[in-house]
Amino acid sequence: MLIPSKLSRPVRLNNTVLRERLLIRLNESSNYRLVLITSPAGYGKTTLVSQWAAGQDNLGWYSLDESDNQPERFASYLIAALQQATQGHCVKSEVLAQKHQYANLPALFAQLFIELSEWRRPIFLVIDDYHLIVNNMIHEAMRFFLRHQPENLTLTILSRNLPSLGVANLRVREQLLEIDSQQLAFDYQETQQFFDKRLTTSLDADDCKRLCNEVAGWATALQLIALSARQSCDAAELSAKRLSGINAGHLSDYLVDEVLNQVGSSTREFLLRSSILRSMNDGLIVRLTGEENGQQRLEETERQGLFIQRMDDSGEWFRFHPLFASFLRQRCQWEMALQLPELHRAAAEGWLAQGYPGEAIHHALAAGDTAMLRDILLQHAWSLFNHSELSLLEECMNALPYEQLLESPRLVLLQAWLAQSQHRYSEVNTLLNQAEQALQQKQIAIEPDLLAEFDALRAQVAMNSGKPEMADKLAKQALAALLPQNEYSRIVATSVEGEVLHCRGELADALARMQQTEQLARRFHVHHYALWALLQQSEILLAQGYLQTAYETQNKAFELIREQHLEQLPMHEFLLRIRSQLLWCWSRLDEAEEAARRGLEVLSNFQPQQQLQCLTQLAKCSLTRGDIDNARRYLARCENLLSNGQYHRDWRTNTDKLRVIIWQSMDDKSAAIRWLAQTERPESVSNHFNQGQWRNIARAQILLGLYDEAESILDTLNQHARELQLISDLNRNLLLCNLLYWHIGRKSEAQSALIEALSLANRTGFISHFVIEGELMAQQLRQLIQLNTLSELELHRAQRILRDINRQHRHKFAHFDESFVTQLLTHPDVPELIRNSPLTQREWQVLGLIYSGYSNDQIAAELDVATTTIKTHIRNLYQKLGIANRQEAIQQAQQLMQMMGLGV
């Protein structure tokens, strides 16, 4: 819940001096990306900008305090301020900020700028007191903000010092408007106006000039002089002399003598008590001071000129001038040290009564009242956790003595979930085990439903650690003891059960459990678990061979992401990745590539290690097109990631599949030998992870001529795939059986395996799995078509596969990889002119791309060089091959294709 006063423009008071010379400059602010107003405290930064803001419609205001160093809090308020400026235009960004569903601040700002790009009018965002930000993460995010903000947005920052935002570049590009303390200082005319508005008896011009010179136009000093001048002109002179040369750091003594000691005891006590509040209203003042009418007291203090200012048009919220607030807090610590804890407790109660647990926690921490902190957490911690207030909760956990945690074991559970949510998996069991042991020693009984919640969390940790049997046991224990109100833990335990069943190959039960998880998660609005359940359903359906149903389930997941604004969660990449994998199966390669690239965009704000699966997908698409060079480039990136991170078996298996197929196409037996010597061999074959890894092993063995070992593996895989109805794995296994039987001369069995694979493909829709087997597959399909034994559907699929294999070979030729050129030059029928031609590898590539119908610009884009460079290559190859134009080049390439047995 956001505090309204932090998003309210300060109210422009009637007796303020209109800073016309500075307002003229600010009226040009729409021509700049950044307006930077810097000065020490008390020079009128906020007052000036509030005067200017009064005439602006599309303006948002964000007043900072120390708590805004939490990135999540900063983001929520900043987006809320821009929502005010745009009348609620940035709905998606607001939801992301409220639910903390973004990778980091730059990722959130990127989404914000997409929405703001549709807003055509000028926008102004004011951030006051930026000097309070000391979190480098926020500074870095604001540097990103300044680099990428829309042209129609102007950011205005008020700060006591130069912020760490890299403004030098903006200054050079004349996109920075700066106002500093010298310009903010009052001139003679403004000083005269200032005193005329505050004093019943006017000062003459010479006196005003002298007073202005004495304090160098410092607005706060002028205000203090005005307070003294109400007593006598001599008092004003004495104040001016005393303030001459003083700065904010040495103002305390003056404020004690000339302000605090000049007010009545009740006002003094009111000022000191209320100083602990960062913002205040009637209810908070009543709670803190015991006065019956807090609003009346606030307005009276304002009339006395005691450095208090309204924060909104309604006059409900007030705050002290920052300089005076700092002074009062310091005096409160000295004069009311013994009462201070009680004051903070009262403030915490006041904030709780108004529905702001975050502010209440701030005061409970300041009071050092861990019992109160514990009580607040017991009431509000899970709400804060579900709103991703993780850093605030972590601070609370660190402040609570361990003994108090044990007195409230549900807070131990919260502490463990904090570790889990921050991926500190190894700490979770340690925290829970230590707590259970300590509670047993103290003979404190743990409620059965709480133990069940412990087990649900432990089950998730066990699943993350690759221990499905332990996870299953814990999940079952949890579900048996959880109460109806333990919704979150029930969702977790049900999901874990579904994952375990999936790993065992019990796909029908796994699907039912994941559908149950989705229903529970949707009912209780735990949207990220609903998304997780849909992703798991898609994977299970794909394993069952129901790819069309998996595709439709993915559509439901995309819809959930759009509805709940989950685009920046890593699970969005998971969805895009499995969509890419499914589209690849169907040989919809352009769409598969697009999905993988979108997945990489989602991951742009995360560690590069997470890119492995999407890069593998891009490599598979290149491989299926016949562009083996590009596939190898992607594979090199994958191998670099594998060497620098720990990955789930499924991830490694996918990349290993790519490796082995490339080694097969290049007859790289030495690489296969090295890999076989060190690769893991899963204990079971009951799920698609393990089936895939054993297929990789069998393919490597076929490459090395280890046919008996490969056949033994494939027999085992097929037996389990048939028993468990792992239809997609059976489809893949049969294609590998076909390869094996062909190599060992069992042509009849090879044909039977291929026919069954084509039959299963009627259900799975597989195309690319056939295509990557290359010319050997094409040869067998041609024979099957000639036999005229295929059904109409299977015949259509076989013809489609043949076309794609043909296109794959054409692509290989178009790119003229080195192995193809070597084969061509050693062909006995190659013309002497070609054999003796000094064509470079790049010129061969250009010739192939000309044949494929590429224009000069397209060739340049494909090879990532300038068009002029391509023209030079074309001129050279024409000269070397004795041809005159593009048509002759195409004819020459076609003759070479036919000579190599590629009938295109």
From Swiss-Prot:
The residues that the entry says bind ATP are S39, P40, A41, G42, Y43, G44, K45, T46
Could you tell me which residue ranges the HTH luxR-type domain spans?
Answer: 832-897
State the DNA-binding region(s): 856-875
Q: Which GO terms describe its molecular function?
A: ATP binding; DNA binding; DNA-binding transcription factor activity
Mind listing the GO biological process terms from this record?
positive regulation of carbohydrate metabolic process; positive regulation of DNA-templated transcription
Q: Does the keyword Nucleotide-binding apply?
A: yes
Asked if the keyword Chloroplast belongs to this entry, the reply reads: no
What the entry lists under PROSITE patterns is as follows: HTH_LUXR_1, HTH_LUXR_2
- UniProt-listed SMART domains: HTH_LUXR
UniProtKB keywords: Activator, ATP-binding, Carbohydrate metabolism, DNA-binding, Nucleotide-binding, Transcription, Transcription regulation
Please give the activity regulation comment for this entry.
Activated by ATP and maltotriose, which are both required for DNA binding.
Quaternary state and interactors: Monomer in solution. Oligomerizes to an active state in the presence of the positive effectors ATP and maltotriose.
**NCBIfam families xrefs:** PRK04841.1
**Role noted for this protein:** Positively regulates the transcription of the maltose regulon whose gene products are responsible for uptake and catabolism of malto-oligosaccharides. Specifically binds to the promoter region of its target genes, recognizing a short DNA motif called the MalT box.
Give the family per the record.
Belongs to the MalT family.
Q: What is this protein called?
A: HTH-type transcriptional regulator MalT
Q: Which organism is it from?
A: Photorhabdus laumondii subsp. laumondii (strain DSM 15139 / CIP 105565 / TT01)
State which gene encodes it: malT
